[in-house]
């Protein structure tokens, strides 16, 4: 495609923290360009998944192509690619940004800049995008435009003098945003090769069409009937249909360079079209793939088990279907003595895990029990081999282990000054190492290296509570570090419950074991016999608590009388309880498994 025909194309994305009004701004832009009639408009048009709407977050990338007649009389093609805002989905954000030449940085004028926007904005600047700041929610009485501009300049370091102040809710100044997109964001540049290169921004599964991929054509063109090659897998597919979203799906005869649209090539699962991969023509391939592709690595693992064992095949089918849509989800069958058959699943983070579990329960009507989430540890065995271990129950015997290494992340926290003390205290409690503190205007950026295991459980919630909701967090994986780690097992009446095992730092093991036993004592219902709950490291018991038996008062019918008669009755009761204990099994309620999660609370 010539540079002339690309001159009026603008590809842009919106960067914003959760709740800063990104989806509402997108709705207004679609409405103003006539993508949907007023009666077809509904709030958050692009958040198509019901969970996205309820939680007010965007999970998957979506796109929309709109014609816009600018004030200079020319018609421009705006391709808007929606991005997720949560830290768990940062790889999807980087792919969406790679498909654009510019980005709108949306900042809530009342709240100021948050860490997630900073991280995504840095990604955009690194990829050479033109960033246009937009201050949203100026209709709020607490909005402070000048302060927000100063924060953008101090924290992110881009010029905010020409920032557009808008209210997406009322539609104020949305036309100025469109003019800024047209005049400040550059058109796509022609590449040095004329062979087809298309970046896969996202893929999802459609029951009728198979996999539909959202692509940005960098060079060349795709049309129905072309034979395309997926560069990382080496597979070839025949293109059935191509088109754009307006937001409705609209078929086109071809997609040319600079354009963003969807293609359907009868691929059967999402793994056949991985996010971030490059498509090219099988007969005339491009010399190299587009940069930046990486396999998505799950960071958090948990066991998912059906409450009713008969639901196991349904759970397998549901996970298979979800995986069609979610390339980051990994799972493999797992059996546990305490919980029966289920799956060990890998997720990007805690939010991802919650969303997957919620979708399984809601869309497939399954009742599930999830075990405590764990991170992946590297275990160096005495024979020199290194294994990745995502399940504490699978830790080899201690005499075979030379060292255990845990994943370390670099966390950047942005907070108002008055909460610095609380946040540093929290990070120190979580075994953090301080890297630095930067004062940026009225905000402070605190950098820490923290063990991922400490962050995964409840760090985010605690961070919000010690800073009254003002601090925001962004993190990325750095390396594995060795440390003195042990596995704490939970025994109930002498039987090990594998689903409750956890790997902890040696220094915290006694406290965690004690807390766990106390918590379990409150949650396991009383039986007809004593239930002993013990925490152990190997064969050493570090803590114990007992759930006392329910017992009938067998002496009630003895009014006075001989003491030996009473003793006989009590001994008889004791014998009965002993027999009961040998045959009795303790049912462990779901809350007990969740107790492991909420230990520090």
From Swiss-Prot:
Subcellular localization is given as: Cell inner membrane
Entry's SUPFAM superfamilies? EF-G C-terminal domain-like, P-loop containing nucleoside triphosphate hydrolases
Disulfide bond residue pairs: none
Q: Which domain of life is it from?
A: Bacteria
Does Protein transport count among this protein's keywords? no
Q: Which GO terms describe its cellular component?
A: plasma membrane
Membrane protein topology class: Peripheral membrane protein
Q: Which reaction does it catalyse?
A: GTP + H2O = GDP + phosphate + H(+)
UniProt-annotated binding residues for GTP: 19-24, 136-139
Query: InterPro entries in the record, alphabetically?
Result: EF-4, EFG_III/V, EFG_V-like, EFTu-like_2, G_TR_CS, LepA_C_sf, LepA_CTD, LepA_IV
Protein name, as recorded: Elongation factor 4
